[in-house]
Every structure is written in structure tokens, then in C-alpha cells.
A protein has these predicted regions:
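Detector for the mature cores of small, proteolytically processed
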Residues: 11-110
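Short, intrinsically disordered N-terminal pre-domain segments
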Residues: 1-5, 9
């Protein structure tokens, strides 16, 4: 998914009350640990984390900064900062609510 498409969908989820962004793959939920730009500059990779994730507003600000620096490039999901061999594409963004917490899931393409 392109950076601006992801940003638009996160903004839409935020308007529904989404507070935190998570990565969802095979029914497992991960936080977003860090963001890496590829050496050739044609994509960025969100690295999965088992720790807490990031608030939607903060993540939108990160995407805005990346867009102004490197433009509307592909956003991928990865598990490792050293290799991009297993990076996966984003399939969709999903809104969910658990008790009082409203969250957004970045669903990974398998």
C-alpha cells in the first residue's frame, strides 16, 4: 500500500475514534516498533514489535514527515531490521473496539 493511501485510511479510522495502531497477521497482534527506509528509497518497512504500539495521531505525523522527505512510496511490514526478504504487503486497515479501547489494525497480506 502506498504511504498516502495508508495515511488516508488511518485518518478515516481516527475519525471513527481509533486511538492506537497495531499490525495484525494470522490473528496475531503486534505493535509498531520502528520504521526503516530501504537503501534505494523505493519503500519503507514497519517493523513488528511485541511491545506497545503507537498512537494513531503520532503515526500519521510520522507518515507526513516521511512523505515530505521521500514522497508517496510503498509501505511494507517486516520483522527484522537487517533483511527485507520476508517483508509483506499491507492488505487492509481494520477498525476494532475492545471494551473502551478503539484501535486500528494494519492487516498483512499473506
Amino acid at each position: 500500500m502506498k504511504l498516502l493511501d495508508l495515511r488516508y485510511k488511518l485518518e478515516k479510522g481516527q475519525s471513527l475514534g481509533g486511538e492506537v495502531v497495531y499490525i495484525k497477521e494470522d490473528n496475531l497482534i503486534y505493535g509498531i516498533g520502528s520504521v526503516y527506509k530501504s537503501e534505494d528509497g523505493d519503500s519503507i518497512t514497519l517493523l513488528k514489535s511485541k511491545e506497545e504500539s503507537v498512537k494513531v495521531n503520532d503515526f500519521i505525523n510520522i507518515l507526513d514527515n516521511l512523505n515530505s522527505d521521500i514522497g508517496d512510496i510503498e509501505v511494507l511490514i517486516g520483522t527484522d531490521g537487517y533483511t527485507r526478504l520476508n517483508d509483506k504487503e499491507i492488505k487492509s486497515i481494520e477498525f476494532a473496539q475492545y471494551e473502551t479501547i478503539k484501535m486500528l489494525f494494519i492487516n498483512v497480506q499473506n
